[in-house]
Amino acid sequence: MPTAITSCPPKLDFDRISAISASTGLPLVLHGGSGLSDHDFREAVSRGICKVNIFTDIDKAGKRGIEKGLAAGAGTMMGLIPYEIQEMKAVVREKLTLFGSVNRA
């Protein structure tokens, strides 16, 4: 299962994000966030990041959901899906709050 696990902690150049945002006036995208702290995400958003592409955390949540479903006795894929979705939704809700995206279009 492919996941973006980093071998060393990432370090965002926040001043560069600010400069790019100021010079382009365009919404900026952060592709990936594996290894970033909540502070890093909040700072990046405050400096001009408008969209964050995340997969690894959601993927891991899906795996946890499947594991919970198996532990609860769900024996079919259809039985596991609700567990997977529940865990993934929780991570998405958490990220939406972290990124300041709740109740925003």
Task: List the predicted regions and their residue ranges.
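Alpha-helix-loop-beta-strand connector modules within alpha/beta enzyme cores
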Residues: 9-30
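Extended, intrinsically disordered, low-complexity segments
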Residues: 66-105
